[in-house]
A protein has these predicted regions:
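Bacterial N-terminal signal peptides
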Residues: 1-11
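Sec/Tat signal peptide C-region and signal peptidase I cleavage site
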Residues: 13-17
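Exported/periplasmic ABC-transporter solute-binding proteins
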Residues: 18-155
Length: 155
């Protein structure tokens, strides 16, 4: 009996392992009129930390960030911000208290809401699962690579 269960478990695991795995890459998306096509990971981090607050054409950068408890937010906090949730909150409280920014990031609650706001707000930038990108937004290359390319840094 144990041998039968073990062989069924191995067969099921083998079948799962052969299924294609969805991309877990995070795409950085901007309003279509934003005059940026490529950012280094360092430049992206500077934007997300609000150290750079304007695009080259002097349009204010509007940062849209997913609400807590989303996989995309957790990934971005770890990879781009290099902070946990508590450090992220404290960072923005301190930044606003020192009057370094007029406001913190706008919070979005879904991919659909993210896309709708990026489309509607000139200068906006955000992140979504690369599998959910639509033609309504512009995907920014990071270090010269798109989310579908090997070596993309946000995977």
């Amino acid at each position: 009996m144990a041998l039968l269960v073990a062989s069924m478990t191995l067969a099921a695991a083998s079948a799962v392992a052969q299924e294609p795995v969805a991309s877990s890459a995070i795409a950085i998306v901007v309003h279509k009129d934003t005059e940026v096509d490529n950012l280094s990971l360092h430049e992206l981090r500077s934007i997300f930390l609000a150290n750079q607050q304007f695009w080259s054409n002097r349009t204010r950068i509007i940062l849209l960030v997913r609400a807590p408890k989303s996989e995309e937010r957790d990934f971005v906090l770890n990879t781009i911000y290099q902070m946990d949730e508590a450090q992220f909150r404290q960072y923005w409280i301190a930044k606003m208290f020192r009057a370094e920014v007029p406001r913190g990031p706008k919070i979005v609650f879904s991919t659909d809401m993210t896309v709708e706001l990026v489309v509607a707000i000139p200068g906006s930038i955000s992140f979504i699962n690369a599998n959910e990108v639509t033609d309504d937004v512009k995907v920014v290359r990071i270090d010269g690579k798109l989310p579908t390319e090997e070596g993309y840094p946000l995977q």
